[in-house]
């Protein structure tokens, strides 16, 4: 097990304006999945994995206490398929379930967050009467270390876009009054 500190970034409101945690202090939030990859590289964690001969990284959300941290079947599938990144999915329980949606976009598999996929798409049924977008992301992944180094490093491959995540963050106005 290797621990490292993920980076932070200023929190912004719906209009992109920086918000304050308290008068004179900018509210900060974790810098997301891309930031986690950058943190692995900047902290030396990726290099430490390389020294230990570890090529696959089990990656999941901290708030999922039920995750099977090392799933031998999932790991074997990942290695056998030759993928750089593998993700688990579950069938959605209902149309508007708040999970990401596995979708093919521009010929590539990706996850579109529920907050970004219009309701009419989330509710769309296929010819068999099943949800067209029924593959839900549980944010459990296996990542190749080289993939992390390429995306999280400082080289040309490190151009990960920021994705806006709407969260309720305690904040104050310029005078220090709680909003």
Where are these regions (language model features)?
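Short, active-site-adjacent cap segments at secondary-structure transitions
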Residues: 10-11, 65-67
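Conserved N-terminal catalytic core of the sugar/cofactor nucleotidyltransferase
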Residues: 1-54
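Catalytic core of tubulin tyrosine ligase-like
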Residues: 49-58, 66-70, 74-179
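Short acidic donor-binding/metal-coordinating loop in glycosyltransferase active sites
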Residues: 62
């Amino acid at each position: 097990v290797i621990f490292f500190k993920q980076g932070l970034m200023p929190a912004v409101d719906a209009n992109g304006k920086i918000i304050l945690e308290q008068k004179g202090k900018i509210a900060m939030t974790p810098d997301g999945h891309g930031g986690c990859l950058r943190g692995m590289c900047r902290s030396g964690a990726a290099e430490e994995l390389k020294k230990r001969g570890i090529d696959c990284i089990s990656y999941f959300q901290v708030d999922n206490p039920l995750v099977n941290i090392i799933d031998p079947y999932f790991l074997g599938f990942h290695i056998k398929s030759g993928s750089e990144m593998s993700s688990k999915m579950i069938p959605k329980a209902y149309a508007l379930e708040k999970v990401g949606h596995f979708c093919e976009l521009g010929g590539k598999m990706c996850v579109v967050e529920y907050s970004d996929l219009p309701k009419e798409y989330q509710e769309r049924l296929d010819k068999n009467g099943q949800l067209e977008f029924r593959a839900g992301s549980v944010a459990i992944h296996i990542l190749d270390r080289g993939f992390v180094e390429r995306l999280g490093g400082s080289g040309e491959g490190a151009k990960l876009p920021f994705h806006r995540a709407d969260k309720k963050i305690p904040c104050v106005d310029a005078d220090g009054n709680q909003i």
